[in-house]
């Protein structure tokens, strides 16, 4: 497999971050500096310069408030990493204007598996709209709607009020819920992610975090195909 994928599976970094490590000459393959795109074969020895032992894998649930940035903050913007004192990164994105559950980890394998479009990983959201929801809204949304030429996958919708609903998706296109609601001639005014697979936001306060551990972690890892429990975590 390619060296960036290998490093991600070993929990060193995401594939993109692994490419950066390789480009900076921080990765050794069989004692020499690795190059981008190289393949790692059975029996090869991969080392990180300056790293002598495997790191402990960490997993956290974080309640991202509105206004906090998950990736590439600009000057003056608050980054998720400012709220969590550990060396972890967010798995996936959550819009600046949205709030709710983010999973933070230093295990690159989680990013690769959770964001892989080949798998259907449930994510649940609480949504409030500007205008009242039409009678046809639930049926149409659940069947899938066309957003700029793309037909969304079937989903589950539960109306919770005249202008509110819960939605469970198994995909994560950019601004998907906002675009789906716009296709239904309405506007999202509040969007909060409440669940990723078995990990729930529950009563976690905004800008607070908690560890994912024990049975909750075992179930989460099993649901993304990581049934083996990593001895380094």
Each model region followed by its residue ranges:
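Basic, flexible Lys/Arg- and Gly-enriched helix-loop patches that mediate nucleic-acid binding at interfaces
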Residues: 1-233
């Amino acid at each position: 497999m390619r060296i960036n994928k290998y490093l991600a599976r070993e929990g060193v970094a995401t594939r993109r971050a692994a490419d950066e490590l390789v480009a900076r000459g921080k990765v050794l393959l069989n004692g020499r500096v690795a190059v981008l795109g190289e393949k790692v074969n059975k029996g090869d020895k991969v080392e990180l310069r300056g790293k002598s032992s495997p790191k402990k894998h960490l997993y956290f649930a974080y309640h991202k408030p509105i206004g906090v940035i998950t990736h590439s903050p600009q000057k003056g913007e608050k980054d998720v990493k400012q709220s969590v004192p550990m060396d972890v990164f967010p798995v996936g994105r959550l819009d600046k204007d949205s709030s709710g559950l983010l999973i933070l980890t230093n295990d690159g394998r989680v990013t690769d598996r959770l964001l892989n479009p080949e798998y259907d990983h449930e994510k649940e959201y609480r949504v409030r709209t500007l205008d009242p929801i039409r009678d046809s809204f639930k049926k149409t949304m659940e069947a899938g709607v066309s957003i700029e030429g793309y037909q969304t996958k079937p989903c589950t919708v539960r109306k919770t009020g005249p202008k509110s609903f819960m939605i469970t998706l198994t995909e994560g296109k950019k601004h998907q819920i906002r675009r789906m609601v716009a296709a239904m001639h309405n506007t999202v005014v509040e969007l909060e992610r409440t669940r990723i697979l078995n990990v729930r936001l529950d009563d976690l306060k905004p800008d607070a975090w908690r560890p994912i551990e024990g049975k909750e972690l075992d179930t989460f890892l099993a649901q993304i195909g990581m049934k083996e429990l990593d001895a380094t975590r």
